[in-house]
UniProtKB/Swiss-Prot annotation:
It comes from Clostridium beijerinckii (strain ATCC 51743 / NCIMB 8052). This is N-acetylmuramic acid 6-phosphate etherase. The gene is murQ. Keywords: Carbohydrate metabolism, Lyase. A lyase-type mechanism (elimination/hydration) is suggested for the cleavage of the lactyl ether bond of MurNAc 6-phosphate, with the formation of an alpha,beta-unsaturated aldehyde intermediate with (E)-stereochemistry, followed by the syn addition of water to give product. GO terms for biological process: amino sugar catabolic process; N-acetylmuramic acid catabolic process; peptidoglycan turnover. Its EC number is 4.2.1.126. It catalyses: N-acetyl-D-muramate 6-phosphate + H2O = N-acetyl-D-glucosamine 6-phosphate + (R)-lactate. It holds the Pfam family GKRP-like_C. The active site is at 86 (proton donor), 117. The lineage of its organism: Bacteria, Bacillati, Bacillota, Clostridia, Eubacteriales. PANTHER family: GLUCOKINASE REGULATORY PROTEIN. Residues 58-221 form the SIS domain.
Length: 304
């Protein structure tokens, strides 16, 4: 790899708007930051066609038994771990389906692991441990777009035949060149020069929100805008589950509780039972036949 040259990276440029941020009032300081943050959504908007393409291709691969795996270092890696960790409780998927790998391992989530991001070989080792296949998708996260760990991971994933996607915040980056789909919201120089946990991190989080949410919608994990595969693992989520059943079916809380008790708090099954008027076993068979899509299962009944 060529010698590191940060001065040409947008993420490392000095922001002329914030040069005097250390001299202004606290209110003016946060106003400046807020104004800079407003630029993030606009940068992401320019990448929507690529994000949509990624969602469709990832969902297709998951239907074939694949997984979604994020790899990154530092803030980017942590964002991948964060997004992956939210999928099981929100959408009822296994912890294997969406995974986050951070350079340096789990310890690096809480404390920077010096030098880990500079090793392409480490990424290869980490992905080999996951036994990736051509049905998997590897999303490389690197605000700078030059992280060796991410480059190595994407290059190896491509050799295996997996779908490769990059999420960076600099145009025409080395990381992007290794990806089949390159998503690059260019948010401009950071409020604090080079601190990519700020706008760049926010942009990456927005992109990951779209990707994981879009994929889960494509997998039938959402009915209307309700998270129907929610795992009710605590009191708050139990009450949320009841509310979801009520909203989806129009029944009251008492009836929703009764339906959920019958299904061992399988929210989707409870909703489909109420809407289809089928018993538990019949409803489960019909849902399974339609790969868990409530709308498709209901349409099949209506067409008879």
């Amino acid at each position: 790899m060529e010698s590191l040259n940060l001065k040409n990276l947008t993420t490392e440029s000095r922001n002329e708007t914030t040069i005097n941020i250390d001299k202004v009032s606290t209110l003016e300081m946060v106003k400046i930051m807020n104004d800079e943050d407003k630029k993030v959504a606009n940068a992401v908007e320019k990448e929507l066609p690529k994000i949509a393409k990624a969602i469709d291709m990832i969902a297709e691969r998951i239907h074939r038994g694949g997984r979604l795996i994020y790899i990154g270092a530092g803030t980017s890696g942590r964002l991948g771990v964060l997004d992956a960790s939210e999928c099981p409780p929100t959408y009822g998927v296994s912890e294997e389906l969406v995974q986050g790998i951070i350079a340096g391992g789990k310890e690096a989530i809480f404390r920077a692991k010096e030098g880990a991001e500079d090793s392409e070989e480490l990424a290869v080792e980490d992905l080999k441990s996951k036994n990736i296949t051509e049905n998997d998708t590897i999303i490389g996260l690197a605000a700078s777009g030059r992280t060796p760990y991410v480059i190595g991971g994407l290059r190896y994933a491509d050799q295996i035949g997996a779908l490769t996607v990059s999420v960076t915040c600099n145009e025409n980056s080395d990381v992007a060149k290794e990806a089949y789909i390159s998503i690059a919201p260019v948010v401009g120089p950071e409020v604090v020069t080079g601190s990519t946990r700020l706008k760049s991190g926010t942009a990456q989080k927005l992109v990951l929100n779209m990707i994981s949410t879009g994929v889960m919608i494509k997998l039938g994990k959402v009915y209307g805008n309700l998270m129907v595969d929610l795992r009710a693992t605590n009191e708050k989520l139990i009450e949320r589950a009841k509310g979801i059943v009520c909203k989806a079916t129009g029944i009251n809380m008492e009836e929703a509780t009764e339906a959920l008790n019958k299904t061992d708090y399988d929210v989707k099954l409870a909703i489909f039972m109420m809407l289809s008027k089928l018993n538990k076993d019949e409803a489960r068979i019909k849902l399974d036949k339609n790969k868990g899509y409530i709308a498709k299962a209901l349409q099949e009944i209506d067409n008879k």
